[in-house]
A protein has these predicted regions:
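Globin-like tetrapyrrole-binding proteins
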Residues: 72
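ATP-dependent small-molecule kinase catalytic core of the GHMP/sugar-kinase superfamily
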Residues: 2-5, 12-28, 122-179
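Short pre-catalytic strand/loop immediately N-terminal to key active-site residues, enriched for Gly-Thr
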Residues: 89-102
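A short coil-to-beta-strand element that immediately follows conserved catalytic motifs
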Residues: 11, 86-91
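DPxDG-like acidic metal-binding loop motif
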Residues: 101-127, 143
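N-terminal, positively charged, Ser/Thr/Ala/Gly-biased leader segments
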Residues: 1-55, 59
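Short, basic phosphate-binding NTP loop
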Residues: 75-83
């Protein structure tokens, strides 16, 4: 099974204060756009020869850091720890959304991995519960469970859906590659 995690833009990003925990409070509009990565999940038989419960591969744009820190792996392990019946899997991420660009590509990948596992293995978790798991992965991850225009506050984890349709407009996104 494959899903295509889209990214988002922030409209009117306003940093309202610095928090004691090192994060910033913000007020912004998260708007999903159709620029996507791809996450594929293939279940393996429980008697597979892999020692790990997940075999992860990646293509496309490179992702800095250790593979073990990839948010897709973290999402799989988060659910696997709570639902031990989830079988071992082959997981592949094809990355087209640049990292560190403020587009939420990594957050989308984590949230969509939760959605993918929920659907593929019939966990039947409601959106509220998936959002709670997503928040453990990152502040803006719950947005991608909803994946509709939202007014976001706090660290980005507090969202309120907005009736905003910008489909009649075109966007030019420039990534200067400075991150």
């Amino acid at each position: 099974m494959i899903l295509f995690p889209n990214c988002k833009i922030n409209i009117g990003l306003n940093i309202t204060s610095k928090r004691a925990d090192g994060y910033h409070n913000l007020a912004t509009v998260f708007y999903p756009i159709n620029w996507c990565d791809a996450v594929e999940l293939i279940p393996l038989p429980n008697n597979n020869s892999l020692s790990a419960s997940v075999h992860f591969t990646q293509s496309g744009l490179s992702i800095p850091g250790k593979e073990a820190d990839n948010i897709c792996l973290k999402a799989y392990l988060l659910l696997k720890n709570n639902f031990p019946g989830i079988p071992p899997v082959n997981m592949h991420l094809h990355k087209t959304i640049p990292t560190g660009a403020g587009l939420g590509g990594g957050s989308a990948n984590g949230a969509f991995t939760l959605l993918l596992i929920n659907k593929k293995f019939n966990l039947n978790l409601p959106a509220e519960q998936l959002s709670a798991y997503a928040l453990k992965l990152g502040s803006d991850c719950p947005f991608f469970i909803i994946n509709k225009p939202c007014y976001a506050t706090g660290r980005g984890e507090q969202t309120e859906p907005l009736p905003l349709d910008l489909s009649a407009y075109s966007f030019l996104i420039v990534h200067p590659g400075i991150h």
